[in-house]
């Protein structure tokens, strides 16, 4: 017997209209908490029949506590926009949910989401051990914005190492020989790959790297500015010369360091990574590695759909 919206509404303790809004993913009509409650009740009642396409893809925001993945930040909003456009092209809806890395039960539940045909996992904060939790999922999935060498997993990510190599080489070609690295206090795999590219570029041009020229800051503009300002004051008090140029792990860090140096009247060039929109309007201007976030999102959707169609 087919489960009705009225039955779901009664079991969930909500109105039929709320059930309809939840099942049709109408944004802004009900809270995310209520939507997830309704979907959970619908699943328990057997509303979603296994073996049939639902026309829905779930985007899983994987939270490992690094505060990197924030959907209101330009990089991730553009990436998600690309996913939404990709889903629209294939006549799918995108539903967003969030899981914490320490919530093993919630992670295991993802493998049995009968409302979704597949998962796009925002893996920016995922470490190797986190990816291991998904390896044997039966539901099709693709991990986005991260990559490891691992069987039974599909990844869609940019080449972080090569991108950082090229932007570092750009500074070297301009004649800079003492180049500092502005790293993140929140370490993720993408940043590790970028550091490898940075070091490789220096090594290929017979340039050494002084560990004292690696600065760690929060990967957000406000906190990063304060961190970099403290570094500048410390170096000044100790009488230590600053590098001739800096490479930053991403544009947020680059913009933070530029702001701090502008306040101190220090005109040292900085290059960034990701090409977020606000970087185009920075003063002084910021050279950065261009990343087509929307295309990355569309490619991820195409890769996922190819796994089950």
Located regions from the model:
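Residue-level detector of anion-binding/catalytic polar loops
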Residues: 48, 88-93, 140, 177, ...
